[in-house]
């Protein structure tokens, strides 16, 4: 037995006779899992065989008793090397299973524990009476029974239940007789009880009052019992039980109120053994407040009954008592100044590999008193900005690094080449077979070689070598070599010497030569023999460079491709001979295709420039030492993603060398080249490599444990020796050795989250490469990679001795941290690009347009507004942002498109004047287009200038123009006008690509980048990962545990992307690496735009970001303009016909019953959805200002529902007076008499949903001010309900576009429908659409029924929206034509009188490319046959058949041959 197991046996005082038995001879402790929260220890033991039942029970009882004394619960399981399936042993353990939770539930135990079991045909057979419910057993008990027997050491058993007729009859008879006896006894007992009762009954006396029940005393006793109750691990609960007590953390809470006013708190808790759903009821608000401690993240003790929830069908605790408890987090117990620094930690930005946010990583290090912590994500630095800000806040140094993928620029084909004629050389083509991949820990078992000259084998070498131990099954299975092959083999040193003699005066050749040569050299060195010095050719690299078009260059695929015999792959003699045959094929092709004749030419003339793409990746950790290093880091990340990306970002060594200033390098993990050299080539080779680095990394033995499973290291002692060797490498290379943790999650309990994430990648991922073959193949276990405290780290390295452990864990890591300077990752200021004379141009354009509209001199209200805005815009350096936006809008206008504004840019009058937005934020006003006379309404009585009555100019009689939406400038750039402007613009989707290219044209390609985004695993996706993990690895989780695991696995980086319209502009006096690295979106190296590596939000305060979004409204307006010739700018905003749409359908010439809605809102942007149509029906807007209100109400959160809607229904307020848009609050409060600053602050608090989150004192101050100025209470209460509000400028821009579209619906309907179907409709069904009103209404009814039953597909939902418009169009007297092979357009509907002709793209399954190809082909000539339509038009047989069914093809024959014969008949 192992020393550790023996120590445990001493502690539990296991009897000596049992300890000396054969069962304990090779006993070992594989692992101990400690759950600190629930004080549960899980032991995992290894034994040679399943223990005798008496021995097992003794071990179990002594473990339980010993640890109970320390208030620790214990569970254990056994892995048995050999399993005895004898009936007696199985029966004993089967019955033992019912003594352990969860199999010990009363119902399960009573029904199944006494059944007999046997082992037949590799199955455990349970003989059961026929009345036992087999399905219930399989669904509720079988998984637990399998799990328990597996824990006893029997492995995963297949269990079948068979019906035993004899047992059924026997038990039935017993049941009947016992039931009769029970009935008889019950009758007799009842009679005797009655007699006794009468005898004991006292004489009748006056009734005395019963003693008063002491509720307080009972409650105190119940509370005392709750405090002392035994805590049950959640994993043990499998059935309904009463008075169970849990302790754990709340991870999800939902509070609901029933119609009767009762409250229910549904919450979920975990103790990290499992998770549970819980419920707590409260009768009123007062009782509800008693349970405020039930909050996310709280640690609670709860008691209640476990019952099956009738709705969820899962076990749920109905909570009776609850108490908040203190949770003792792990702490770093080392004294101040003696704490380690973690230098290798991954965050959730390590793609699909790590869990912690950078904030949580830094917070944990700071909480433990560490002075610094490093961030080293895989190949990216996307956590840097958040890490930078969090570290500054936490007062801790952040060390910025990454774990890079280093490759050699050019991987040589030949090592140590000399001037030699390849045709005249003699070659020794050799292969070795080994017991593993480590030259230091595994053994040579075969060396075979073929000596070849001019393609002929002239001599062969083949020797087996006895490693001195039996071969593993895996080695035998892989190589075909058995222990019999090795019997009588020569000693290793003899074979090595003989092979050296065999190789003299030859070029050595091997496939993947670095492995074979490394193994040979390590063995030569170990036996004091000279290493290989002659030239070596690697046929793997030879093939990669000679045949780059091949996907696979392994020996097997190559031999198949070139028809070279390979009968027994992975036996050295066969592999060597096959490699030799391939070599001479390669030499021939190299000579004929590339003129290569000399050995030196292989590397100089054949190795490709991009051979780094196939080079083996080695990990290295790179750290930023200073500001120069930060920029170099950004350059390296950019180059690895842009220029050297191949599967993963790669950094060629020469590129790293060129940018190494300000950077420090570590040797990384077991995938680093120094660790690999120690393992495969020896210390000397590792020392040579280590000189390249600044320090050597060593990691806790637990991190290297998977290497044991992969047979790269033999055992724990082997791991410790490798670590000692790495320390020796550091000593000889004069490099410090630092202990790092390779952190991938923070707490030990979080290991399962990473397991789920990593396993979701499938077996194609390297980390999931399997061990073994066939059905038994499993991925190697993941290492224990939590964030370790200094104490835990010192314990991991205790085998080094106290002083050395302290040096590598504490002293050296602190010294390294001291070498790192503070750097500025994120700039503190805004850096806008430079445009010559931007300030003068913005001012000039503004006044020029203002003078044109309002005259010179300007009205005071206009002059003051412009002066106020320009002071802010020019004074804060924002002029270039305004000018850039103006240039983009102007270019799009010149191409014939309107550009709609988004957000609050319409709050800026300067933006209006220079043409960025159509929205005029001034108070409602009249202005004369002839003499520029103006009138402003500033008392708040009018909500929008468009609602002013028409009237002529009093000076010249010209009809006034009306404008002004009364929006304060403060809502755009803040009260002080210094907020960075965020100008969002809606370009036509058709023109958006051109607008993007305009940015490049204006600022330059090297300064314009798409705004990058980072996509993470969503909880729904994580849920799928958990269910997949359950399926693939035989796990069984209750619903609450699935939810917990999904939440834990969510948030991990999965991919990158780009903002749909965001473009970041770098100032032209700096370069992009001053702000961020760059990359391609989603690693798509064919993309036309590069993106910022950082999420654009991380740098949006530092650089200009232009939102150039694509939108349908400008496209629709352009289409309508093309069809009608009407300039959309001339369409009035107060057209009576358009406004009539909001109150009825008469203007359309139809009834509400005909089109299924009481207003004409169908298909109108902003107002056509069911939700907004309902709002219109309730409010009946009649003015532009009220439409703005509706727009704000529909886009806000908690602004309409439960707020304004109720106020209007109850007659407290009207649509005009409720709070609709955010800006209205400031304007209304200023009109009420509040100071502008306070009005602005109240608006900001309300619009962000902060009204109830600010301090009561602050809120009461605002309320008092509002009441002093007669603001009604309903208005104040409404403010408190709002979570988010829509900007009025945004609403104005959208409503203006909507009214223009509506204008065409009223006055030019066929054009409107043509534009709608061409641009907005998402789904078509031509057979229905052209089938007339009855067909359309029937299909709509069909979808309506499906919707009620939740059966409608997304396509059907989209189709319903289309059919609503089709129905309206048909009811208005217009028609839908059929698809016409020679008249239909590819993608747009065509107008023919009162009929619309659909395009080809409207046919289901016919894409844009095929549609365009059909149109192009018909221009070249008529389609004479269906075959020709398929061939020239590119239509599939299915599409042609569909066209034929719809009578689109007429009498078109199948092929041209038939059409020729038609002429004769």
UniProtKB/Swiss-Prot annotation:
Reactions that this protein is recorded to catalyse: DNA(n) + a 2'-deoxyribonucleoside 5'-triphosphate = DNA(n+1) + diphosphate
CDD domains: DEDDh, PHP_PolIIIA_POLC, polC_OBF
One cellular component term from this protein's GO annotations in UniProt: cytoplasm
Top-level EC class as recorded in UniProt: transferase
EC annotation from Swiss-Prot or TrEMBL: 2.7.7.7
Molecular function terms from GO: 3'-5' exonuclease activity; DNA binding; DNA-directed DNA polymerase activity
Keywords: Cytoplasm, DNA replication, DNA-directed DNA polymerase, Exonuclease, Hydrolase, Nuclease, Nucleotidyltransferase, Transferase
Domain of life: Bacteria
SUPFAM superfamilies: Nucleic acid-binding proteins, PHP domain-like, Ribonuclease H-like
Domain Exonuclease: 427-583
GO biological process: DNA-templated DNA replication
Compartment(s): Cytoplasm
InterPro entries from the UniProt entry: DNA_pol3_alpha_NTPase_dom (IPR011708), DNA_pol3_finger (IPR040982), DNA_PolC-like_N_II (IPR024754), DNA_PolC-type_N_I (IPR028112), DnaE2/DnaE/PolC (IPR004805), DNAPol_HHH (IPR029460), DnaQ (IPR006054), Exonuclease_RNaseT/DNA_pol3 (IPR013520)
Residue spans crossing the bilayer: none
PANTHER family linked to this entry: DNA POLYMERASE III POLC-TYPE (PTHR32294:SF5), DNA POLYMERASE III SUBUNIT ALPHA (PTHR32294)
NCBIfam families: dnaq, polC_Gram_pos, PRK00448.1
Function as written in the Swiss-Prot or TrEMBL entry: Required for replicative DNA synthesis. This DNA polymerase also exhibits 3' to 5' exonuclease activity.
Similarity comment: family membership: Belongs to the DNA polymerase type-C family. PolC subfamily.
HAMAP family assigned to the protein according to its UniProt record, in alphabetical order: DNApol_PolC (MF_00356)
The protein's name in its UniProt record: DNA polymerase III PolC-type
Organism: Streptococcus pyogenes serotype M12 (strain MGAS2096)
């Amino acid at each position: 037995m192992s020393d550790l197991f023996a120590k445990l046996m001493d502690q539990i005082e296991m009897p000596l006779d049992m300890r000396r038995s054969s069962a304990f001879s090779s006993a070992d402790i594989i692992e101990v899992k400690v759950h600190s929260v629930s004080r549960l220890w899980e032991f995992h033991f290894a034994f040679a065989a399943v223990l005798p039942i008496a021995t097992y029970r003794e071990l179990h009882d002594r473990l339980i008793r010993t640890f109970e004394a320390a208030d620790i619960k214990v569970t254990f399981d056994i892995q048995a090397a050999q399993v005895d399936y004898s009936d007696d042993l199985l029966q004993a353990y089967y019955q033992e299973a019912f003594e352990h939770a969860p199999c010990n539930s009363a119902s399960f135990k009573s029904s199944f524990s006494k059944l007999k079991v046997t082992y037949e045909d590799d199955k455990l057979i349970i003989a059961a009476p026929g009345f036992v419910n087999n399905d219930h057993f399989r669904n509720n008990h079988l998984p637990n029974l399998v799990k328990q027997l597996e824990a006893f050491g029997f492995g995963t058993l297949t269990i079948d239940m068979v019906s035993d007729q004899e047992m059924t009859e026997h038990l039935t008879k017993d049941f009947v007789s016992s039931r009769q006896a029970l009935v008889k006894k019950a009758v007799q007992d009842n009679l005797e009880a009655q007699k006794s009762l009468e005898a004991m009954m006292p004489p009748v006396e006056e009734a005395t009052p019963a003693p008063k029940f002491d509720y307080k005393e009972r409650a105190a006793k119940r509370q005392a019992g709750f405090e002392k109750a035994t805590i049950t691990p959640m994993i043990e609960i499998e059935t309904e039980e009463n008075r169970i007590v849990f302790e754990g953390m709340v991870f999800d809470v939902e509070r609901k109120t029933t119609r009767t006013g009762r409250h229910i708190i549904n919450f979920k808790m975990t103790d990290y053994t499992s998770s549970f759903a819980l419920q707590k009821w409260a009768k009123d608000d007062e009782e509800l407040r008693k349970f405020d401690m039930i909050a996310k993240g709280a640690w609670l003790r709860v008691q209640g009954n476990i019952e099956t929830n009738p709705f969820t069908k899962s076990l749920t605790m109905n909570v009776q008592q609850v108490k908040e408890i203190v949770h003792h987090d792990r702490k770093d117990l080392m004294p101040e100044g003696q704490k380690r620094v973690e230098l290798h930690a991954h965050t959730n930005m390590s793609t699909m590999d790590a869990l912690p946010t950078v904030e949580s990583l830094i917070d944990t290090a700071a909480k433990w008193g560490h002075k610094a912590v490093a961030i080293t994500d895989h190949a990216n630095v996307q956590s840097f900005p958040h890490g930078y800000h969090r570290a500054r806040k936490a007062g801790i140094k952040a060390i910025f690094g990454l774990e890079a993928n280093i490759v050699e620029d050019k991987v040589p084909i030949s090592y140590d080449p000399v001037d030699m004629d390849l045709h005249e050389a003699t070659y020794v083509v050799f292969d070795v077979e080994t017991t593993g991949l480590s030259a230091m820990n595994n053994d040579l078992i075969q060396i075979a070689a073929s000596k070849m000259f001019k393609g002929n084998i002239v001599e062969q070498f083949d020797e087996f070598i006895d490693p001195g131990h039996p071969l593993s099954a895996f080695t035998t299975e892989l190589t075909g070599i058995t222990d019999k092959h090795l019997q009588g083999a020569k000693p290793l040193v003899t074979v090595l010497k003989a092979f050296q003699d065999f190789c003299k005066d030859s070029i050595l050749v091997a496939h993947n030569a670095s492995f074979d040569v490394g193994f040979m050299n390590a063995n030569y060195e170990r036996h004091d023999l000279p290493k290989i010095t002659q030239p070596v050719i690697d046929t793997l690299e030879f093939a990669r460079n000679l045949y780059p078009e091949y996907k696979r260059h392994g020996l097997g695929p190559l031999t198949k491709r070139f028809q070279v015999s390979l009968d027994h792959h992975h036996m050295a003699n066969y592999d060597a001979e096959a490699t030799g045959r391939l070599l001479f094929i390669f030499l021939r092709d190299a000579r004929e295709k590339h003129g290569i004749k000399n050995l030196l030419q292989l590397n100089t003339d054949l190795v490709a420039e991009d051979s780094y793409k196939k080079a083996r990746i080695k990990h290295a950790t790179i750290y930023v030492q200073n500001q120069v290093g930060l920029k170099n880091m950004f350059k390296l990340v950019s180059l690895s993603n842009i220029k050297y990306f191949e599967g993963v970002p790669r950094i060629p060594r020469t590129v790293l060398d060129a940018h190494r200033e300000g950077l420090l390098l570590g040797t990384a993990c077991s995938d680093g080249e120094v660790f690999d050299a120690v393992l495969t080539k020896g210390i000397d080779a590792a020392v040579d490599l280590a000189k390249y680095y600044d320090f050597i990394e060593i990691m806790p033995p637990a991190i290297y444990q998977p290497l044991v499973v992969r047979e790269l290291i033999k055992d724990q002692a082997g791991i410790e020796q490798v670590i000692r060797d790495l320390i020796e490498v550091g000593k000889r290379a004069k490099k410090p050795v630092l202990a790092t943790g390779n952190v991938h999650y923070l707490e030990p309990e979080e290991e399962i989250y990473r397991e789920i994430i990593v396993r979701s990648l499938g077996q194609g991922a390297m980390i999931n490469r399997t061990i073994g073959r066939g059905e038994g193949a499993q991925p190697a276990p993941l290492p224990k990679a939590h964030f370790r405290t200094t104490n835990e780290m010192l314990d991991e390295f205790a085998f080094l001795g106290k002083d050395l452990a302290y040096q590598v864990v504490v002293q050296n890591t602190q010294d390294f941290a001291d070498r790192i300077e503070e750097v500025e990752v994120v700039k503190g200021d805004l850096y806008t690009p430079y445009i010559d004379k931007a300030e003068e141009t913005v001012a000039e354009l503004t006044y020029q347009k203002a003078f044109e509209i309002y005259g010179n001199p300007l009205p005071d209200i206009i002059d003051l507004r412009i002066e106020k805005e320009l002071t802010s815009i020019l004074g804060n350096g924002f002029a270039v942002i305004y000018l850039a936006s103006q240039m983009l809008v102007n270019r799009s206008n010149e191409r014939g498109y309107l550009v709609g504004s988004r957000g609050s840019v319409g709050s800026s009058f300067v933006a209006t004047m220079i043409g960025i937005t159509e929205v005029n934020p001034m108070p409602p006003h009249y202005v004369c287009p002839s003499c520029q006379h103006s009138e402003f309404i500033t008392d708040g009585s009018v909500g929008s200038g468009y609602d002013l009555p028409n009237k002529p100019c009093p000076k010249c009689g010209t009809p006034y123009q009306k404008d002004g939406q009364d929006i304060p400038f403060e809502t755009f750039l803040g009260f002080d006008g210094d907020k960075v402007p965020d100008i969002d613009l809606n370009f036509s989707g058709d023109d958006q690509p051109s607008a993007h290219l305009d940015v490049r044209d204006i600022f330059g390609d090297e300064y314009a980048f798409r705004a990058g985004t980072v996509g993470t695993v969503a909880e729904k996706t994580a849920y799928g990962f958990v269910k997949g993990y359950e399926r693939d690895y035989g796990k069984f989780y209750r619903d609450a545990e699935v939810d917990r695991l999904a939440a834990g696995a969510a948030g991990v980086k999965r991919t990158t992307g780009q903002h749909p319209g965001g473009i970041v502009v770098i100032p032209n006096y700096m370069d992009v690496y001053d702000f961020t690295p760059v990359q391609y979106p989603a690693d798509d190296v064919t993309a036309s735009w590069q993106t910022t590596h950082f999420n654009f939000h991380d740098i949006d305060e530092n650089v200009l970001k232009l939102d150039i979004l694509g939108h349908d409204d400008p496209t629709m307006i352009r289409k309508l303009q093309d069809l009608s010739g009407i300039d959309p700018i001339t369409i009035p905003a107060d057209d009576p016909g358009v406004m009539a749409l909001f109150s009825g359908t008469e203007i359309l010439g139809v009834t509400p019953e005909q089109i299924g809605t009481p207003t004409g809102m169908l298909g109108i942007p902003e107002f056509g959805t069911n939700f907004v149509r309902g709002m219109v029906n309730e409010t009946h807007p009649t003015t532009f200002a009220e439409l703005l209100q509706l727009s704000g109400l529909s886009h806000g959160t908690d602004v309409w529902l439960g707020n304004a809607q109720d106020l209007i229904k109850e007659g407290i307020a009207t649509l005009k007076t409720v709070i609709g848009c955010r800006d209205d609050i400031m304007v209304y409060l200023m009109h009420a008499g509040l100071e502008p600053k306070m009005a602005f602050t109240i608006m900001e608090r309300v619009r962000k949903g902060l009204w109830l989150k600010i301090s009561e004192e602050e809120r009461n101050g605002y309320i008092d001010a509002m009441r002093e100025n007669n603001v009604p209470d309903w208005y104040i209460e409404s403010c408190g309900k709002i979570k988010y509000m829509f900007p009025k400028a945004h609403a104005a821009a959208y409503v203006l576009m909507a009214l223009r579209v509506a204008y065409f619906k009223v006055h030019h309907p066929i054009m409107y429908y043509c534009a709608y179907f061409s641009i907005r409709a998402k789904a078509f069904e031509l057979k229905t659409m052209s089938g007339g009103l009855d067909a359309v209404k029937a299909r709509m009814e069909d979808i309506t029924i499906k919707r009620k039953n939740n059966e409608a597909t997304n396509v059907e939902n989209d189709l319903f929206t289309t059919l609503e418009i089709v129905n309206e169009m048909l009811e208005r007297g217009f028609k839908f034509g059929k698809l016409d092979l020679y008249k239909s357009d590819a993608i747009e509907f065509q107008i023919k009188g009162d009929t619309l002709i659909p395009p080809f793209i409207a046919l289901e399954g016919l894409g844009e490319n095929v549609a365009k190809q059909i149109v192009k082909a018909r221009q070249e000539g008529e389609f004479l046959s269906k075959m020709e339509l398929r061939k020239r038009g590119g239509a599939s047989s299915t599409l042609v058949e569909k066209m034929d069914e719809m009578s689109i093809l007429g009498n078109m024959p199948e092929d041209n041959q038939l059409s020729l014969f038609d002429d004769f008949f």
